[in-house]
Curated annotation (Swiss-Prot):
Gene that encodes it: hldD
The protein's assembly and partners: Homopentamer.
Active site: 140, 178
GO annotation, biological process: ADP-L-glycero-beta-D-manno-heptose biosynthetic process; lipopolysaccharide core region biosynthetic process
Keyword Transmembrane helix: no
Protein name (record): ADP-L-glycero-D-manno-heptose-6-epimerase
Keyword Flavoprotein tagged: no
Cofactor(s) it depends on: NADP(+)
Details of cofactor binding: Binds 1 NADP(+) per subunit.
EC numbers: 5.1.3.20
Naturally occurring in which organism (per UniProt): Klebsiella pneumoniae
Pathway the protein takes part in: Nucleotide-sugar biosynthesis; ADP-L-glycero-beta-D-manno-heptose biosynthesis; ADP-L-glycero-beta-D-manno-heptose from D-glycero-beta-D-manno-heptose 7-phosphate: step 4/4; Bacterial outer membrane biogenesis; LPS core biosynthesis
Length: 310
């Protein structure tokens, strides 16, 4: 069996899909479906069982067995960069991850987990997986950073695989439940379909992000599991592009509309990453050599998925 925590969420459900595509269906999805809309991410997928996150954590802490586990993909976390309840964030992202890590280490189960580019904070260069480059801007980024630091202490002595992925700006299918935290491509598509002008913040051409397609993210997760490589790795494309190419690809797909530029919100000033670009040196050294989709390729594929029933 393979366990995917956060399996009804954005990246988790795409990992389930990637496993299904390889003929793997003996999957336990762990999630919190208090937001019931997330069920749609699993409707077209095949899994063996579902468990609530709280029930799962109780069983993990009690040391209960789940049968033979081939791997745990730990994608379950609070991923909101605007959540400032530090106790909630540390319980959900840090403590939960530690419990699961030690459960895996005791049983030599491969443990693949979600870190984040938010660990780098407001950098504008040198997004490198090393302590001197890490200074998160929000409590979400801090929770991810602290767990990475914890993993670094354990890695030299670990007898089983531990790998963390610092996801950059991931977009693609199955993110609709994320609301305001969904990608710009998702929001632009929704605005166009609602007959509205698609909107970007003023100065968006000055914000550059490493936009990585979720299908590529799932492929990297599976490659590392299959190859048993440990460590903490950036997971982006290595390219930084402004929001304009995202908008251009969206408009090109819809063959209509023009961008309306709106004022940048005060609440995000000083807490907004203006630039992200993954340094892929360590990822490539580890042996992952596949290309990543460009924004034009990824957004076009995503638009086709979003509008498949139109």
């Amino acid at each position: 069996m393979i366990i995917v925590t956060g399996g009804a969420g954005f990246i988790g459900s795409n990992i389930v899909k990637a496993l299904n595509d390889k003929g793997i269906t003996d999957i336990l999805v762990v999630d919190n479906l208090k937001d019931g809309t997330k069920f749609v991410n699993l409707v077209d997928l095949n899994i063996a069982d579902y468990m609530d996150k709280e029930d799962f954590l109780i069983q993990i802490m009690a040391g209960e067995e789940f049968g033979e586990i081939e791997a745990i993909f730990h994608e379950g976390a609070c991923s909101s960069t605007t959540e400032w309840d530090g106790k909630y964030m540390m319980d959900n992202n840090y403590q939960y991850s530690k419990e699961l890590l030690h459960y895996c280490l005791e049983r030599e189960i491969p443990f693949l987990y979600a870190s984040s580019a938010a660990t780098y904070g407001g950098r504008t260069s040198d997004f490198i997986e090393s302590r001197e480059y890490e200074q998160p801007l929000n409590v979400y980024g801090y929770s991810k950073f602290l767990f990475d630091e914890y993993v670094r202490q354990i890695l030299p002595e670990a007898n089983s695989q531990i790998v963390g992925f610092r996801y950059f700006n991931v977009y693609g299918p199955r993110e609709g439940h994320k609301g305001s935290m969904a990608s710009v491509a998702f929001h632009l598509n929704t605005q166009l379909n609602n007959g509205e002008s698609p909107k970007l913040f003023e100065g968006s051409d000055g914000f550059k992000r490493d936009f990585v397609y979720v299908g590529d993210v799932a492929d990297v997760n599976l490659w590392f599991w299959e190859n048993g490589v440990s460590g903490i790795f950036n997971l982006g494309t290595g390219r930084a592009e402004s929001f304009q190419p995202v908008a251009d690809a969206t408009l090109a797909y819809h063959k209509k509309g023009s961008i309306e530029y709106i004022p940048f919100p005060d609440k995000l000033k000083g807490r907004y990453q203006a630039f992200t670009q993954a340094d892929l040196t360590n990822l490539r050294k580890a042996g992952y050599d596949k290309p990543f989709k460009t924004v034009a390729e990824g957004v076009t594929e995503y638009m086709a998925w979003l509008n498949r029933d139109a």
